[in-house]
């Protein structure tokens, strides 16, 4: 048995050697946290320090330099997270993970996250565009400075920040990531599809017993959905659920597949925030707490930072006061999302309004490429997308859109297996996919607010996702406000957006937006 002992010894040596190599690689990938780094684009030195509570403090001679500094530290500590998220929203995961993430890429290309982000960027003020540009420069130049070293994920997958082009981040990526957060917190379209699916086998009463608006509530619509869908001939005539030949996914690919399956489902998730006026506290000052519940991830979704800069002027003549804000940032965005300034604090929970509607688009059997509208037949808007797939050739995706939005049944397998694709397609109307979405601009303005009224004004342009915000300032003013855009629907819309509606009937179209002043609010000035 001497050979067994020698083999075991060789195995141990090999394991230790491999472990040593991994350890060396991990150490080499650690960011440089001490000393000085020359960062291109800075107009003056930026001071960066980290305290015992794991809060990163960034102070620049201008707001633009401070945002460059935040981009720098996000790249240092969350480089792979930024790269993965960039690829996710751009539909470029399959380039490094192979065919197992192809469904994810197809969905992202169909939603057109980056294309819409580019349009939304043009509608932002010069000041906000400059802030996003400065932040992107901080990320890009962090990699060029040598202070950021590729983590093992880059090595294992044979890629670099920004992929082949080396563009690690851009302003439209920040807007794209804001849209991704809105998608994650949207929550309604998955429930609509669940009601469509259940309508194939349940009657009206059973459907609402299984899927009520909330447990114990009455049906949200008087329309007999199973009868309506049966009358329209929505469902596929036979089972189309045959297993597809796809490779066994790795961990990242499995996450991607699970995400595509569950996107649009928010049931059971929750957060909490609290604000207590000074009349109920020992100190006589308000107390505010926030506990947002987002998905568990490693690294975490949030990154805590303190941003400081003197008063100044941004492009477009935007005069701003001194910047002094601390709280939770999102890697990918240059502002504190949840936190406080010297004068006011705020916290979010998800409001969960109905901002997504699915539409059944009736197809013209005699004219391929046409769908029915209230005024007749219309051509789909179409564009071709090329997806690079590791280990195989490129995949060309033909994306279709209607007057409501992208056709998601083309890229969601569970949709195409359920409906009769010869007669119908399913499109998505989603509030976030509008060119006037200025959520990121509202985020910038909140970071300068010093009172509750200033904060309420800053949130005026917040669009998606709608959030329930509690606020408190040092003057003792506390308030609650739902901030964001909610679509209005006509009284004749009897389905009320709780299940897929006939897209060719104008009564189911959105009619506008609820004015900001009419959003739910409580003010205890």
Model regions: which residues?
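Alpha/propeptide regions of enzymes that mature by internal proteolysis
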Residues: 46-48, 439-461
């Amino acid at each position: 048995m001497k050979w067994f002992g020698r083999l075991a010894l060789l195995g141990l040596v090999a394991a230790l050697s491999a472990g040593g190599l991994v350890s060396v690689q991990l150490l080499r990938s650690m960011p440089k946290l001490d000393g000085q780094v020359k960062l291109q684009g800075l107009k003056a030195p930026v001071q960066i320090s980290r305290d015992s509570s794991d809060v990163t403090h960034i102070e620049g001679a201008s707001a633009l330099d401070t945002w460059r500094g935040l981009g720098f530290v996000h790249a240092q500590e969350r480089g792979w997270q930024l790269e993965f998220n960039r690829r996710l929203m751009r539909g470029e995961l399959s380039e490094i993970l192979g065919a197992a993430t192809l469904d994810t890429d197809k969905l992202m290309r169909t939603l057109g996250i980056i294309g819409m982000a580019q349009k939304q960027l043009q509608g932002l003020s010069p000041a906000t565009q400059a802030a996003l540009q400065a932040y992107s420069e901080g990320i890009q130049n962090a990699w060029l400075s040598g202070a950021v070293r590729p983590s093992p994920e880059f090595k294992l997958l044979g890629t670099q920040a920004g992929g082949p082009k080396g563009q690690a981040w851009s302003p439209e990526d920040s807007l794209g990531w804001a849209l991704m957060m809105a998608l994650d917190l949207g929550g309604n379209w998955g429930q609509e599809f669940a009601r469509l699916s259940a309508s194939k086998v349940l009657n009206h009463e059973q459907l609402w017993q299984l899927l009520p608006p909330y447990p114990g509530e009455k049906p949200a619509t008087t329309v007999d959905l199973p009868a309506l869908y049966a009358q329209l001939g929505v469902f596929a005539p036979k089972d189309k659920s045959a297993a597809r030949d796809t490779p066994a996914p790795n961990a990242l690919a499995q996450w991607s597949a699970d995400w595509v399956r569950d996107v649009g489902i928010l049931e059971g998730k929750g957060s909490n925030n609290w604000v207590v006026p000074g009349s109920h506290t020992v100190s006589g000052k308000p107390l505010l707490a926030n506990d947002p519940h987002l998905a568990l991830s490693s690294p975490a979704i949030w990154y805590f930072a303190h941003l400081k800069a003197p008063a100044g002027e941004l492009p477009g003549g935007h005069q701003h006061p001194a910047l002094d804000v601390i709280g939770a940032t999102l890697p990918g965005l240059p502002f504190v999302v949840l936190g406080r300034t010297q004068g006011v604090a705020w916290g979010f929970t998800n409001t969960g309004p109905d901002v997504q509607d699915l539409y059944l688009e009736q197809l013209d059997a005699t004219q391929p490429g046409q769908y029915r509208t209230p005024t007749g037949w219309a051509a789909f808007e179409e564009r071709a997308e090329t997806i690079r797939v590791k280990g195989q050739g490129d995949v060309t995706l033909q994306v279709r859109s209607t007057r409501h939005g992208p056709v998601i049944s083309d890229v969601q397998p569970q949709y195409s297996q359920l409906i009769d694709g010869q007669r119908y397609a399913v499109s998505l109307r989603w509030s976030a996919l509008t060119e006037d979405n200025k959520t990121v601009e509202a985020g910038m303005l909140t970071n300068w607010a010093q009172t509750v009224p200033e904060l309420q004004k800053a949130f005026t342009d917040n669009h998606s996702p709608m959030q329930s915000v509690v606020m408190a300032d040092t003057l003792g003013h506390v308030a609650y406000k739902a901030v964001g855009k909610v679509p209005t629907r006509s009284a004749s819309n009897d389905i009320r957006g709780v299940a897929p509606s006939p897209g060719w009937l104008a009564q189911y179209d959105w009619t506008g937006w609820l004015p900001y002043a009419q959003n739910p609010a409580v003010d205890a000035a």
